[in-house]
Amino acid sequence: MNVCSNTTKDPLTLMAMWGSMKGYNPEQGFSFEGPEKRLEVILRCTLETHVDGLRSLDDSVWSGVVGSLNAQIVSRESNEYINSYVLTESSLFVMKNRIILITCGTTTLLNSIPNILEAISAVRGELEWVSFMHKNYSFPWMQKGPHTSLADEFATLKQHFPTGKPYIFGPVDSDHYFLFCYDDIIRPCSSEDDTQLSMTMYGLDKEQTKHWFSDRFISTSAETAAIRAATHLDRVVDGTWTLHDLQFEPCGYSINAIRDEEYQTMHITPEDHCSFASYETNSRAANYSDRMKKVLGVFRPQRFTVIVFLDPESPVGKAYNEGKGIGVEPEYYPEYNLLHRTTNEFAPGYVAMKINYVRTAAVEETDTAVGGAEPGAEGGPD
């Protein structure tokens, strides 16, 4: 899963790729890009759409989708609502009316779009919503086209979805997200109750990361259960979830979990110089603090970014629109300082919120972590 580079890049070139200069070290031989690219495509079901939608397609279709971005399917689980796939680089979830594809490293996620559109056509669905997003790359100079620059990513997306709109959440020279949305939802619709919680964490506790190194590849077994118990991952993904996980060789770990219509996924890069973990779920709750505290308890990061998407009819969306706390606010995390917060409303009641936190003890120190945010005073809403 590791890549290496000894190419010298000047600051302007790196900024053109909208990464941070903090992580660039030409003497560092191996650095894995933990922050993922994420693509979600939702179809509108019509009278002509296959009754099982996208889940009617066999695994060979999804192997083709994943192969087009230079990854492979490693394991699979399913329930009544979701097909879950752990990949060589992160995860794929397939539901009746949507695909969620999350890939790390130097995968070329946008190259999968033609295959995905073919899959939608095969089940006679209509394209309703597309979102592509990723946090700023830790090692942008290692990416492959069309991900070598923001301009190339944007041009590729506009080619496929001409009416889509781009957004940037956060300071361009540190922790931020690029988001592109295509919206063809016919409103008012019957229900808009989706939700998404994503966390990216840097500077992980070394007492935890030591568990995610191995001299061999280990798939879901008593051995991976022991890893989950030792790291307290089993407090995040408990026995009510159907899970499949992978311990990579020489290091790295991925887990997917599904329960009815909900999913959780985590991916871990444990190397000291680029330690990183990501977490995502669509689990329904009116307040995320309990879940986020469990995740932070596993990784104990020096800093983290949380991004939340709230549909108006979701439990957390209703709480937000009623002026209640939703569990991402700084009062829930006294050991961290809020550095920056961005909120955007895409459509009536549909909100995206991104918040950067840094551990309190590290605020006055120089942050040397890969792709690091500038330490500083607490920020407020934009």
From Swiss-Prot:
Pathway: Amine and polyamine biosynthesis; S-adenosylmethioninamine biosynthesis; S-adenosylmethioninamine from S-adenosyl-L-methionine: step 1/1. SUPFAM superfamilies: S-adenosylmethionine decarboxylase. Keywords: Autocatalytic cleavage, Decarboxylase, Lyase, Polyamine biosynthesis, Pyruvate, S-adenosyl-L-methionine, Schiff base, Spermidine biosynthesis, Zymogen. Belongs to the eukaryotic AdoMetDC family. The active site is at E33, E36, S90 (schiff-base intermediate with substrate), C104 (proton donor), S254 (proton acceptor), H267 (proton acceptor). The record marks E89, S90 as: Cleavage (non-hydrolytic). GO terms for biological process: spermidine biosynthetic process; spermine biosynthetic process. It is an enzyme of class 4 (lyase). The record marks S254 as: Important for catalytic activity. One of its GO terms (molecular function) is adenosylmethionine decarboxylase activity. This is S-adenosylmethionine decarboxylase proenzyme. Substrate binds at F32, L87, F248, E271. Its EC number is 4.1.1.50. Is synthesized initially as an inactive proenzyme. Formation of the active enzyme involves a self-maturation process in which the active site pyruvoyl group is generated from an internal serine residue via an autocatalytic post-translational modification. Two non-identical subunits are generated from the proenzyme in this reaction, and the pyruvate is formed at the N-terminus of the alpha chain, which is derived from the carboxyl end of the proenzyme. Its cofactor is pyruvate. Heterotetramer of two alpha and two beta chains. The lineage of its organism: Eukaryota, Discoba, Euglenozoa, Kinetoplastea, Metakinetoplastina. Binds 1 pyruvoyl group covalently per subunit. It catalyses: S-adenosyl-L-methionine + H(+) = S-adenosyl 3-(methylsulfanyl)propylamine + CO2. The modification Pyruvic acid (Ser) is found at S90. It comes from the Eukaryota. One of its GO terms (cellular component) is cytosol. It comes from Leishmania donovani.
